[in-house]
A protein has these predicted regions:
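Cleavable N-terminal signal peptides
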Residues: 3-4, 14
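Polar-ligand-bearing catalytic/cofactor-coordination segments
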Residues: 17-74, 79-242
Length: 242
């Protein structure tokens, strides 16, 4: 893990050195419909710094995500949370649900400062965010609520499979995870995304017509286009498709 972490940190700089040594001025590329080469500008120092910083936090997040559960397990905190959940709940599935909520709340508080540094502070330091601290906290608390609800409703399933089939519970859990993932793909744009963004009709009707025509040409009939004032949060995203 440490090797991978160090590799992630230093690989952007190594890549930048190779890039800058191999490309004297600008890269060129062509596409099928281009009449000539298209110049690709060399990444700026700021872009390379952002890339390196983002990868640092990505690697740190992997290690942190392993460290925190291990800390709960080996310090006995997990057992204490279990005891509290058992006092509050009678049935085993309620105990698991309550444990999930308590664990999620504690880890949320532990992770919040890290999230502030790796997300809110970093994006603002590179001038890529318009998000206020209030909106950032609001989004995090919404994510917390969703995590608590999902954990309470569904975490008991793998434990039930573990009780019924100690040898193959992991296989059955994996099989059940497939339809669950597809369900979440359908649910997210309808009920979860609107919790973070305000969707409305597209103001530029001419652009909407072009987008719908392109979708129909691609075999996607009956599409709808919505507009979100995402510039309130970020300067990086201008559109996405779901």
């Amino acid at each position: 893990i440490i090797f991978i972490f160090l590799l992630v940190i230093f690989s952007p700089q190594a890549g930048a050195q190779i890039w800058q040594s191999d490309v004297p001025a600008a890269q060129t590329s062509t596409t099928q419909n281009d009449s000539g080469p298209v110049a690709v500008p060399i990444a700026s120092e700021k872009a390379l710094s952002y890339y390196k910083t983002r990868n640092f936090w990505w690697g740190f997040g992997i290690i942190w995500g392993l460290f925190v559960p291990a800390l709960f397990l080996f310090t006995g905190w997990s057992a204490k949370i279990r005891d509290v959940a058992q006092r509050l709940g009678k049935k085993w599935f309620f105990v698991i649900g309550l444990y999930s909520i308590i664990f999620t709340l504690i880890t949320f508080l532990i992770d919040l400062p890290i999230g502030y540094l790796s997300d809110y502070s970093m994006e603002h330091s590179f001038g890529l965010s318009n998000q206020t601290i209030g909106k950032w906290l609001q989004d995090n608390f919404i994510s917390l609520a969703i995590s608590c609800i999902m954990g309470f409703l569904f975490l008991w399933v793998p434990y039930l499979l573990l009780k019924k089939s100690p040898q193959r519970w992991w296989l059955y859990t994996s099989i059940l995870a497939v339809p669950f993932i597809f369900l979440m793909i359908l649910v997210q744009p309808l009920w979860i995304d609107p919790l973070f963004n305000k969707f409305g009709p597209m103001q530029d009707k001419a652009l909407e017509t072009k987008i719908l025509a392109l979708a129909e040409k691609s075999g996607i009939a009956g599409s709808r286009v919505f507009e979100v004032a995402k510039s309130e949060d970020t300067k990086k995203v201008n559109a996405y498709v779901t």
